[in-house]
Amino acid sequence: MTAITMVVLPLQAQDTTAHRDTVPAVPPAPSIEQLQYMDGLKTVTRGVAQLHDGLSRVSRTQQADSATRHHAAKRLGGLCGTARSFIVSGRPKMKPSAYSDSLRILAKQLTLRLDTLTNALPICERTAGRDPAVATALTTKLKSYDDALLAFKTSQAAFYRPDSAKAQPPTPQ
């Protein structure tokens, strides 16, 4: 025989107070200088994509015959010229003074790495078809730029994201 025991707990008072909806804090709107910086970065990114394409072609053809490798290296030289035109047109808009504090430091690092990359492009244009070391040196500079870009974008995303601790609705008591 089974006995079932029921326990009745007293009803707790229902919370009848109206809770205000909490809206997450709106991140600050970017300034005109910051918009110009991002516009310049967008243009620069087109040039960097050209470099990635050229270096990718060179690395894919390393196991191919010498004529294919030579063709890929010459193509890299041409893409270095195209990339340089995009980078040179976008770089003047990228003024690190558009940002403050740590974001300014990262923006400055990004522009310095971009300038280093830009300085290597004329050599790439002239000698990429003859000297395979050009692709190696360019890959190193491009990796350095990509790391700086990642740090800048990560910091920028964290800066413009609303604080999740402040956006939580109050818990009922």
How does the language model describe each region?
Residues 1-10:
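Bacterial N-terminal signal peptides
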Residues 9-12, 54, 87, 114:
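Hydrophobic alpha-helical elements and their junctions with loops/disorder across both membrane
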Residues 14-78, 151-172:
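Immediate post-signal-peptide N-terminus of mature secreted/exported proteins
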Residues 75-145:
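Long, amphipathic, charge-rich alpha-helical segments that form helical bundles/coiled-coils
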